[in-house]
Every structure is written in structure tokens, then in C-alpha cells.
Amino acid sequence: MLESAYMAFSSKAIRTFLFTVGALVGIVLLTALALLLFFDINGYKPRVEAALSSALRMTVTIEGPLRLALLPGLRVTLENVRVRNQGAELALVQEVDLAIPLLSLFEEKIRYSNIATKGARISIERYGDGNGKRNNYERQPTDSRQSRPLDLPKISFAGLTVVYADKQSESQLEFNTCKGELNDMRNPGGEPFLKQLSFRGQFSCGEVRGKGKGSPATDLKFSVVAREGVFDFAPITIQAYGGQGSAKLRMDRSREVPTLELSVTLSKFRIEELLKPLSSPSSASSGKSVSGPMNFSTSLTARGASRLAMRQSAQGDMSLSGSNLKLAGVDLDGQLRKFELSQNLSLLDVSALLIAGPVSLVVTKGFELATPVRQAGVSTSIHNVISRWKVEKGIAHAVDVALTTDENRVAVQGNLDFVGDTYQGIVVALVDANGCAKARQKISGPFNKPVADQSNILVPVGPLLNLLDSAKKLILGSSDNCEVFYSGSLPSPK
């Protein structure tokens, strides 16, 4: 009897519970349906724009309509959302889809379970330090306001394009056909925003195109994890200049002074692809070129609140190496055999290749293959290249920088000042089997306009070779007793 009564009560309780849940769900659905039928959301567009502008501390306008949808779940869609800061456009998003849990309509604050963007184009403009212009991504000062708490399960990006323009160096990178997502974005509120931000995510881009005529890098992929202001980008992979690149980047914004740690490896890339964006019409018409596979790696750390401070504190190592390269249009060994180091042959022809290691496009953009006269149908085989540098306080010091051909060895000493963008005591020398300098050439000036000193280049020709060889020994001294210019890892050719 008691068992029957208990079972009847349990069955009734279950039916009552299910009826209650069903009624609540029905109320929520009817409420959402009423919103769709009777609520004109576009009338609230000015308030939405004002709320977004206040949250971002930028100017946000919604140029398209706002739409409500019920399935699959309550969603609000915004079309053609434009974000401007200090008069400059920062972003234009074709569509923003906001997924809202139905039960959150009855809470004090509306929550979003997902934000999906489509067709976003983000334009980042960076100016130099101390020029009075604010970067277009920097928000207005907070005054007494603080960032609101953030708890967003997911935000996704489809059809994303990002354009980064450095106004000081006039360089630009464009990331196309990108997609990705960020998950578990959280911030307890307060300032500064980045110091307390946490999330995880992954992104990919079909191509990365620079300003100029070079081939774009492709297949960029990276993951990112942020924990209370520390951002770890790893692994990063990319196809660039015909080679495979990988990198790791850590940015620590949790401290008073931000810090950065970067390591990059680019394996088996083609040096001709790297130098292609740097060539001018005159150098292209000269018919001279260098080609072959090379490897590059660097590991750097820096700290500072500005780009200048980062440069001044940079330290680490850089290395470039390669084998079996070809310098077309120049018979370097044939010319050196006669010591014709004149306007018709300059050590700048190979110094750009040696200096390319630590500075890549930054420094070598001032160099072209310097010899004005091309030798038709000839070339130079470069057997090995090593370019190792130590970076301290923003200055790269040559550690082991040299190359070898069939008959000769060329080496470099000196420093590269990344802070002032200048060459410091760079000397390119032709060295003998003992590492002694047989001829030297000094390079000075800014990175983009290097100046080569021709005053101490030997210019012996034809029948004067023996006489000038004796004069060379008087000036430089015997190779057995000379001051060693190069004692690095590359042996002299046999």
C-alpha cells in the first residue's frame, strides 16, 4: 500500500517537474518570439553604438541593419560595423553575430555565449616614438573609468584581413584569407586591460604580403595562450622565401616594463627570394644576382615601453649560413686574381650577402650588387657563407662573418647599430690563408644609404702586378707576421 502510494507520488512529482520545466521553456520561447514580432531592435541602434563606443573608447557606427533570430538560439546580427579611432579607421566588419543564452534575458546583465565575425578588415597604423601622433589602435586615456569585467566563451573570425603599416619605416604587411578563434576570454575588470587578460586561441592565414614586388609568404599558422597579461605565441609556422619558418614569441605585459622574447628559424630559404624586393630597376637590368639555399636563426630578448627602448635593450644571437651559392654576372676570383679591386669590382658585391644575416631586409635594402659593369656569361661559385653576430644593447657585433669561393676568402669585422640604424666600423676584407687582410674596404653611414671607402683598395693591373705585389708586402707586411683579421670557422680554400 505504502509502496503504491510512493510510486504514485513520485510519478506525480516527476510530471509536475516536467510540466514546470516545459512551462518555463515555453515562457522563454514566447518571450523570444515576442521580441522578434513586436520589438524593433533598429530603434536601439544609437544606444548600441554608444555602448560599444564607450566600451572601446573609440567611435563605433553600425551602417547596416540589426536583426534578431530565434534559431538555433537567440542571436543578434549587426551588419557593416565600422570602428574609428582619432579619425582613422581601425576596423570594418561586414557581419557580427551575437549568440545570447535565452535565460540571460532574465538576468541583470546580458551574456554572450559566442560572437562570430565575418569579413573583418583591421588596419593597424604605427607611428614612430616621439612624433606626437598616437597609433590608431591606442585607446583614449581612461581618466577615472575602468575596463568592465569580461567573460566570453568564444569569439571567431572568418574571412579576416589584417593590414599593418609602419609609418616611420614606410613598410607594410598584409595578412589575407585569415581565420581563427579565441576561447575563454576573461578579465576581472580594471586597468590596465592587458595585464589581466586571459584567453587561448589559434589562427591561420593563407598569405602574408609585404610592400613591394616580392613573393608573399604563405600558410601562416599559430596558437596563442594569454595568462594574466603574459602572451605566448607558439608554435608559429610559415612558408617564406621558399623555405620553412618556425618561431616562438612571448610578450609579458604583466610587469611595469613590458618584456619580449623571440626565437625564429628559417630553413632552406632561397636568398634570391629574400633579396628580390630590394632590387631596383638599375640592379635588375645589370644582370647580376645571387642565388642558392640558406638557413637563418635568431634568439632575442628586449624590454621597454617603447620601440626605441626595446631596440636599446635588445640582446641575443643571430646567424645566417649557406653552401653552394652562385653570384651571377661577376667573376670574383678572376678579378681578384689581378687585384682589380676598383670601381669595376667592389667588395660590396659580397658584403651585402654577409651582412644579410643579422639585418635581413632592414640593412640590405641600402645595398645592391655594387659593381656597375656586368661580366656577361660569368659567375662566381660561393662554397660557404657564415654570418654570426652577438647582439648587446641594440648593437650587433660580428663574431664569425665570412665566405669562401674557389680561390678566395672574404671576411667582415665591425658592428651594426640597430638603435641609430648605422654601420659602426664595418670593414670587409680579402684575407689570405693565415687570416691576414690583403685588401680592405670600409663601410659607414646609415643602413639605407651605406658609403664605401675606396681610398685603400689596391688597384694593380696587367704588367704592374709584380711591382704592386712587392709594394703590397711593404705596406701590409709579410703575411707570416701580420695582424690576423679573421680567425673564424671557415677555412681558406685550397
Whereabouts are the PLM-identified features?
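Alpha-helical membrane-targeting segments
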Residues: 68-74, 101-108, 339-372, 434-436, ...
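Solvent-exposed beta-strand/coil patches in large extracellular/periplasmic or lumenal scaffold regions
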Residues: 136-170, 174, 181-252, 259-262, ...
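Outer-membrane beta-barrel proteins
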Residues: 124-127, 271-275, 327-330, 452
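N-terminal type II signal-anchor transmembrane helix
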Residues: 2-57, 478-493
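Short secondary-structure junctions
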Residues: 54-61, 393-395
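C-terminal or late-domain output modules
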Residues: 415-478
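Extracellular beta-strand solenoids
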Residues: 112, 117, 122-124, 175, ...
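Flexible beta-edge/linker motif
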Residues: 67-129, 143-165, 185-197, 308-310
